[in-house]
Amino acid sequence: MSVTDEPLLSVDGLQTSFYTEEGEVKAVNDVSYQIDRGERFAVVGESGAGKSVTSLSLMRLIDDPGRVKGGDVTFRSTSAVATLARKFPEGVATENSPGYIHVTELRSESGAVGSDPGATVRDNPTDVATSLHDGSLHIEAGHVDVLDASEDAMRELRGNEIAMIFQDPHTALNPVYTVGEQIAEAIRKHLEMDDGAAKERAIEMLERVGIPDAEERYSDYPHEFSGGMQQRAVIAIALSCDPALIVADEPTTALDVTIEAQILDLLKELSNEEDVAVQLITHDLGVVAELCDSVMVMYAGKPVERSSVEELYYEPKHPYTVGLMSSIPRIGDDRERLDTVPGTMPDLVQLPSGCSFHPRCPYAEDACLEHEPPLVDVETGEPVEDPDPAVHSAACLEYTGELQDGVDFDVQIREDAATDGGESV
Amino acid sequence: MRRVYDSEALRRDDDDPFSPVEDDESASRNHVNWTNLSHALVPQAIRSRAIAVDVETDKDRYEPGEEIHFGVTFANRFPLPITIVTETPKSWEWSIDGNPKGSEVPADHPEDRSTFHFSRSERKRFRRSWSGRVRVDEKEWRSAERGEHTLGVGIDAVNGAEKLRAETTFQIE
């Protein structure tokens, strides 16, 4: 399998807990997914479902008392492998020594290099280059184990290869530095440009995210920007170093709908034209329909449904997803009141036995109290070991044949609303 | 209009007790971090005696399938801050018949030590409940058998853990 066939990011069995006096808060509990190059992947769920903690874990931004307890995060980018191998040769894995930088295929000017490419890279770190640059050793395939990487290596990855757009631009921007300086800082750090070149690129970035008169606005402070412009400045910081993956944590929650549409268009354009993968965290299913290719629904720190966006909207399989869908207000809807998912998210210190959703599920039976459903293929009922985006999977006993009465809901797709993914459940 | 700098709000005077002092170095010299001092001076053996542990269920008898609600209290008997060093980051744990959180699946807490801190004479109260179902596997539970069950609470302290435990019993009928 060549490197481009493999997903850019694989998250496998991720577990993150916060140890508080109340007990262990299991914020992320065995989450697996993968994102391909240029794919737009959504993580949706209520507040407290573990969406943001999942993203912060893969960026290694979990602070005490939080701990990433288990799992693997594999990031397959040859440029990331090349940069890290050059700067941290001691982290390159060889046949005899472990490491977090794995070089699986290496070429030199004369052809493919020996049986242990890791050792070759470790011995010649200065020669390591990607195929884009001149150099005697080209890394053709490799990956980085993000959770094992050193703190210095993570600082190289963050912002450069994996960028994050934070939820609230007011707190993400530093009020005492100009907006331009905050963008230029990331460029100077990662792209090793001098002050003048970094400023030029920062202005280019501001123009790109649609800030008018970017040259003038470069030296404005964040308070001189409107909310939408601040969010665009945060996006400009994220884009400034041409990342391979952008993790966007509710990027449009603080914005009005017209600016939201512009920001979504910008993210779409980036992923289409530059093959940037986007992991979008949101609780707005409308945004998911607008932007994303595939989606994972989370509940109480676990994935409950995973599928392509079309299948999720037209054929939701998990009762929680159905509940979320039916709580979306729609124009022309003649219902007196919106349906809601009754109750609240369970306390993550003591999760209910069996299926975590059973206390709120209208279809819950005795079996749901004693068996926790694994994520299964909804067609075959077979557990899904490898998170394959093409397989529609849901964690409900309905699909393992253990429910007696089954789940029973209708999805009606209205012709007039079908264009914006509208249906009522 | 009176400006803020005309208000003398920032007037500093060492002799006037109602205005900020010119030099606040003396104030910082008086500051003692009692938590750290107590942690340094109180012997380990006394620390585990200082904390009283108590656990109480809301009833003595429960129907099968009924949720068991209970309260846990940790009280610092000393008028000094006490810090207990724990084996794992988990400050305390409850168990049913010796199974942590009613689960036969072993817990997997990281093996790095942490601390459980009490201010002087502090009482910490926690409310918890148990569903009455024993976790027998990662994804399987079964109803608890009828009869007497023991609910235990303890701090997994590095020193004197045996003193930092409490137990109670209840019946499922």
Please describe what each predicted stretch is.
Chain A
Residues 35-36:
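Conserved hydrophobic segment flanking the Walker A/P-loop of ABC-type ATPase nucleotide-binding domains
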Residues 250-251, 255, 259-336:
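P-loop NTP-binding/switch modules centered on Walker-like glycine-rich loops
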Residues 159, 223, 240-241, 265:
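Conserved signature/switch motifs of ABC ATPase nucleotide-binding domains
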Residues 44-46:
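The feature captures the beta-strand-to-loop junction immediately N-terminal to the Walker
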Residues 233, 238-240:
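ABC ATPase C-loop
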Residues 76, 196-216, 325:
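Conserved ABC ATPase "signature" region
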Residues 4-8, 17-30, 61-68, 78-112, ...:
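A short, flexible loop at the N-terminus of ABC-type nucleotide-binding domains that lies
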Residues 21, 81, 309-424:
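Charged, flexible cofactor/metal-binding loops and thiol motifs
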